[in-house]
A protein has these predicted regions:
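N-terminal positioning helix adjacent to the helix-turn-helix/winged-helix DNA-binding module
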Residues: 6-7, 14
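Short amphipathic alpha-helical elements of helix-turn-helix/winged-helix folds
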Residues: 14-18, 35, 94, 177
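C-terminal peripheral helix-coil segments that are non-catalytic and often amphipathic
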Residues: 90-94, 146, 150-158, 172-231
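Short coil/turn segments at alpha/beta junctions that flank glycine-rich nucleotide-binding fingerprints
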Residues: 21-25, 76, 98, 158
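Short, solvent-exposed beta-strand-terminating loops
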Residues: 99-120, 176
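Hydrophobic alpha-helical connector segments
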Residues: 56, 71-103, 167-174
């Protein structure tokens, strides 16, 4: 079993290198076999097809992502708000250093959105649906976010985050903001843009806005009371 796991890892690591350098579409299973020095037949023994291999890669991505979230949550001497702030920095750093893995995570989110609806589920490649790794991902893809929810809950308890916020809704809102923030680093980093902003100024601005929202310095305005007469 250890030898088999090692071969699976060799194939997966080779796939990550080739998907990163050549792109997913341009990479063939034979390229991966050649990269790892293994017969094509043996490669197919461990992974049924490229789609199955990519789902295995996605599972690896979620496992590493969960480790990032766990490490932030378990860090000592920090408030919930400080942990959320650290998490933003860690996610962006993870995406920068492991772009193919981060992209796989975002791609899976799109797949789940399609999977949830019977009509759009038909648009998913059947080879993906057949992958045991895809089925496993359906079970575990919320696990990283569970640590984020616990960070928000901690912040509410320690007073660093507004007490009226609901932990699950709050974290998934934060999570969607982080995804959008990471995506915008490309456009704001483009030299030909006309807006006066760059990645170096966007990150501290994003963090301050997020902190202010969670601390409650940005309060929703209450509608003014309108007094009326019955007569």
């Amino acid at each position: 079993m250890p030898k088999e796991k090692n071969k699976e890892k060799l194939i997966l690591d080779a796939a990550i290198r080739l998907f990163t350098s050549k792109g997913y579409q341009a990479t063939r299973m034979s390229d991966i076999s050649q990269e790892v020095g293994m017969s094509k037949g043996l490669t197919y023994f461990y992974y049924k097809n490229k789609e199955d291999l990519f789902m295995a890669l996605t599972k690896k991505a979620f496992d590493q992502f969960k480790d990032e979230f766990r490490e932030v949550y378990l860090s000592k001497g920090k408030t919930g708000l400080e942990k959320i702030t650290d998490l933003v920095i860690r996610v962006v750093d993870f995406a920068s250093k492991n772009q193919i893995l981060y992209d796989a995570i975002i791609n899976f989110m799109d797949l789940v959105k399609k999977y949830n609806q019977e009509e759009s589920r038909k648009e998913i490649d059947p080879l993906i649906l057949e992958s045991q790794h895809f089925q496993k991902l359906l079970e575990i893809h919320h696990e990283p976010a569970k640590f984020g929810v616990m960070m928000v809950s901690q912040g509410i308890k320690d007073g660093s985050i507004r007490p009226e916020l609901q932990p699950e809704i709050t974290f998934y809102t934060i999570w969607s903001m982080i995804i959008g923030f990471e995506k915008m680093l490309g456009p704001v980093g483009y030299d030909g843009k006309e807006v006066k902003i760059n990645p170096e100024s966007l990150q501290p601005g994003f963090l301050k806005l997020l902190q202010d929202m969670l601390k409650g310095t940005i309060q929703a305005s209450k509608p003014a009371t309108v007094q009326t007469s019955l007569f």
